[in-house]
């Protein structure tokens, strides 16, 4: 059997950058907000290097914390909470996802109603929704 790997196989540049960022900052006081990527092997390797995962900033009790935002991004309130606690913030969000955050915020500010269609609990969708800042916005969809 012959196996051919496409020239573009592997992680996309946004994920690759997020992993490199986590490795760069790995250590005793390093946390990621959620899984930096969806890959258990990589997450295990980062954990062995001292990177801890949290689902909520309130889980961190470390005045020297460095918090890395996952490649999928996070809502504005997460960034605000990290800054309010005085933690060092490292944003490893994929640039394409950051662009979506800016677009959502721009159109929300212009008074548009933003509808996000996707897997409602996926971290990327949750993060995008977190830039709407309006209670009538809804995440719609299933896996």
Mark where each language-model region is:
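N-terminal beta-loop-helix "entrance" segment that forms/cooperates
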Residues: 34-51
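Ser/Thr/Gly-rich flexible loops in soluble cytosolic domains mediating phosphotransfer, phosphorylation
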Residues: 83-112, 116-120
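Short internal beta-strands
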Residues: 30-36, 116-118
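Conserved phosphate/anionic-ligand binding catalytic regions in large, soluble enzymes, centered on
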Residues: 7-20
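Short, well-ordered, mixed-charge alpha-helical segments that flank or form enzyme active sites
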Residues: 76-78, 98-101, 122-127
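Extreme N-terminal starter segment of soluble prokaryotic enzymes
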Residues: 1-4
